[in-house]
């Protein structure tokens, strides 16, 4: 049950931060928090990570729905038996649903976290959650592999 609460907190944080960006910033506006290093930049992405597959709204909605169903089924099966994998999936679930809401409502994802120093693509809380979840999942696979040797 905790895993769904974690996902819900991620979804709420993601949607709240995106709401603030849409409400208080103009599209394209950039506010330096650390000059030339990290900015809040109001951006919209109609594709996937790094802007690939632009204007494929229904494709992403369908894929995300399948992924979310798969994650929920996996959480039901794994639950407390594999807590690290379940934690990872809860992060991915929260991030996937956060971006799904954007795509379903407006056809685009609100991005705003901009590391200008390294010219990294602009991203959001949902993207961070997905990345953290995948990282935890990779760590889990690595640690389980070492344990089973």
UniProtKB/Swiss-Prot annotation:
One of its GO terms (biological process) is proteolysis. GO terms for molecular function: aspartic-type endopeptidase activity. It is an enzyme of class 3 (hydrolase). Keywords: Aspartyl protease, Cell membrane, Hydrolase, Membrane, Protease, Transmembrane, Transmembrane helix. The active site is at 111, 127. Pathway: Protein modification; lipoprotein biosynthesis (signal peptide cleavage). Its EC number is 3.4.23.36. PROSITE patterns: SPASE_II. It is found in: Cell membrane. Its main location: membrane. The chain crosses the membrane at residues 58-78, 85-105, 122-142. This protein specifically catalyzes the removal of signal peptides from prolipoproteins. This is Lipoprotein signal peptidase. The lineage of its organism: Bacteria, Bacillati, Bacillota, Bacilli, Bacillales.
């Amino acid at each position: 049950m905790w895993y769904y609460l974690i996902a819900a907190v991620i979804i709420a944080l993601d949607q709240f931060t995106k709401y603030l960006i849409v409400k208080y910033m103009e599209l394209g506006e950039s506010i330096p928090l650390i000059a030339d290093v990290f900015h809040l930049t109001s951006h919209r992405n109609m594709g996937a990570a790094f802007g690939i597959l632009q204007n494929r709204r229904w494709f992403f909605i369908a894929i995300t729905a399948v992924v979310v169903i798969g994650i929920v089924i996996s959480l039901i099966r794994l639950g407390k038996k594999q807590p690290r994998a379940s934690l990872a999936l809860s992060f991915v679930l929260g991030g996937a649903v956060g971006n799904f809401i954007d795509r379903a409502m407006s056809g685009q994802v609100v991005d705003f976290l901009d590391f200008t120093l390294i010219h990294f693509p602009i991203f959001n809380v949902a993207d961070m959650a997905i990345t953290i979840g995948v990282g935890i999942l990779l760590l889990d696979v690595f640690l389980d592999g070492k344990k089973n040797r």
